[in-house]
C-alpha cells in the first residue's frame, strides 16, 4: 500500500492552492494524498488508513486532535502558517503548545531565522525542526506563479 498523506485545511481561501501543490509533489513521489477539512477528517479517523498528517498549527486548541491522530498510529508534521512575523517569545509560546510540540514528528520552518529562534526557545525539540520554506510562497515563484502575475 502507498504511503498516505493527509493535508488538513482550515481556511480554503488561504490554504487550498498550496495544499494542491503539495499533493501533486507528494503524488509524484508515490504518496496517496487526501485533502480535507479538519472536522471531516477527524470524524472519519476510525475509517482512515494511518499516515502522515500535515497540519497548519500546533496551538493549544489542537491538542485534542493531535492526541486523537496519534492514538490511531499517525505521524504528525506541522507548519505555522502565520509564523512569518515574530512578536517575541510570549507570542510564540501561545502559538506553539509544548504538549503538541512533544507529539509532533516534525515541524517545518519557513527559514533560517525561524529555525534558530525555535531551537533557542525549545532546545529539547531541536531535532524536530527542519527548514523547508512554505508552499504558499513556493507557488508564488516561477514557473508556478503565472496565475499570480496577472493578479
What are these regions (language model features)?
Residues 3-149:
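Active-site and donor-binding regions of nucleotide-sugar-utilizing enzymes
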Amino acid at each position: 500500500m502507498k504511503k498516505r498523506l493527509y493535508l488538513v485545511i482550515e481556511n480554503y481561501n488561504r490554504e487550498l492552492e498550496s495544499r494542491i501543490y503539495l499533493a501533486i509533489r507528494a503524488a509524484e513521489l508515490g504518496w496517496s494524498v487526501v485533502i480535507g477539512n479538519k472536522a471531516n477528517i477527524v470524524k472519519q479517523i476510525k475509517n482512515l488508513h494511518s499516515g502522515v498528517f500535515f497540519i497548519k498549527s500546533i496551538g493549544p486548541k489542537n491538542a485534542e486532535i493531535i492526541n486523537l491522530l496519534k492514538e490511531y498510529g499517525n505521524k504528525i508534521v506541522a507548519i505555522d502558517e502565520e509564523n512569518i512575523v515574530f512578536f517575541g517569545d510570549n507570542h510564540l509560546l501561545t502559538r506553539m503548545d509544548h504538549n503538541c510540540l512533544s507529539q509532533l514528528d516534525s515541524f517545518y520552518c519557513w527559514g533560517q531565522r525561524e529555525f534558530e529562534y525555535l531551537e533557542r526557545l525549545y532546545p529539547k525539540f531541536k531535532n524536530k525542526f527542519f527548514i523547508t520554506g512554505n508552499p504558499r510562497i513556493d507557488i508564488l515563484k516561477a514557473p508556478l506563479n503565472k496565475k499570480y502575475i496577472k493578479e
